[in-house]
């Protein structure tokens, strides 16, 4: 599976994942909206939005 792994609004980069899912975490801090992308579907703390999906580059 190919997942996107760029941070926030950086140009898209991808990585090959052994997992069968990709994730996108979104949260707010003093710099504004932060986005983290990667492989798998991690646990997140309250207040962090998590989207997991199972198709190539679905977490862009």
Curated annotation (Swiss-Prot):
Record has Disulfide bond as a keyword: yes
Subcellular localization: Secreted
InterPro entries the record matches: Snake_3FTx, Snake_toxin-like_sf, Snake_toxin_con_site, Toxin_cobra-type
MF-aspect GO terms: acetylcholine receptor inhibitor activity; ion channel regulator activity; toxin activity
Disulfide bonds: 3-22, 17-39, 41-52, 53-58
Tissue distribution: Expressed by the venom gland.
Keyword terms: Acetylcholine receptor inhibiting toxin, Disulfide bond, Ion channel impairing toxin, Neurotoxin, Postsynaptic neurotoxin, Secreted, Toxin
GO annotation, cellular component aspect: extracellular region
Homology family: Belongs to the three-finger toxin family. Short-chain subfamily. Type I alpha-neurotoxin sub-subfamily.
Free-text function comment from the UniProt entry: Binds to muscle nicotinic acetylcholine receptor (nAChR) and inhibit acetylcholine from binding to the receptor, thereby impairing neuromuscular transmission.
Name of the protein described by the UniProt record: Short neurotoxin A
Organism: Aipysurus laevis
């Amino acid at each position: 599976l190919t997942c996107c792994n760029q941070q926030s609004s950086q140009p898209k980069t991808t990585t090959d994942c052994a997992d069968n899912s990709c994730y996108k975490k979104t949260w707010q801090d003093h710099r504004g909206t932060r986005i983290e992308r990667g492989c798998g579907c991690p646990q997140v703390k309250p207040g962090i939005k998590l989207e997991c999906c199972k198709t190539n580059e679905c977490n862009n």
